[in-house]
Amino acid sequence: MSRRTAREASMKLVFQMAFNDDHVDEVGAEDILAQAKEELNYNNYQYIETVVSRTESNLQKIDEYIEKFSENWKIDRLSKVDLSILRLAISEILFFDDIPTRVSINEAVELAKKFSTDKASGYINGILDQVANQLNKAR
């Protein structure tokens, strides 16, 4: 399984959280991981486990970034798909030093092109660029 496919599985798990009081549904997680089990290698399985766990544990902080840079949009007005993609990418940007920020942003844009509307990729790119710029100023 490529890292891109692992990100897709992770995004699906984060998406499920939006419908389960912002917690991972163990049964749903097992289903998603079972679908990709043939292709999972250890590193990608670890990535999925870690990114979903860190996203879940730091949801409030991640959502604060989304709220801050979602001009004229409340977080509850965002589509669950877009919200999940943003949460996953911001989690990567904040907590995965081994993943370049540009890679996280580009992969989020690709997820949006695949799973969301035509305009979502630009919107997601804009929010993530602002998050990255703020974090670069803080470092």
Curated annotation (Swiss-Prot):
Which species does this protein come from? Natranaerobius thermophilus (strain ATCC BAA-1301 / DSM 18059 / JW/NM-WN-LF)
Q: Its function? A: Involved in transcription antitermination. Required for transcription of ribosomal RNA (rRNA) genes. Binds specifically to the boxA antiterminator sequence of the ribosomal RNA (rrn) operons.
The UniProt gene name for this protein comes to nusB
Q: Name one GO biological process term.
A: DNA-templated transcription termination
Name it: Transcription antitermination protein NusB
Family stated for the protein in its record:
Belongs to the NusB family.
Q: Which GO terms describe its cellular component?
A: cytosol
* Cystine crosslinks: none
GO molecular function, one example? RNA binding
Keywords attached to this Swiss-Prot or TrEMBL record, sorted alphabetically, are: RNA-binding, Transcription, Transcription antitermination, Transcription regulation
**Record InterPro entries:** NusB-like_sf (IPR035926), NusB_fam (IPR011605), NusB_RsmB_TIM44 (IPR006027)
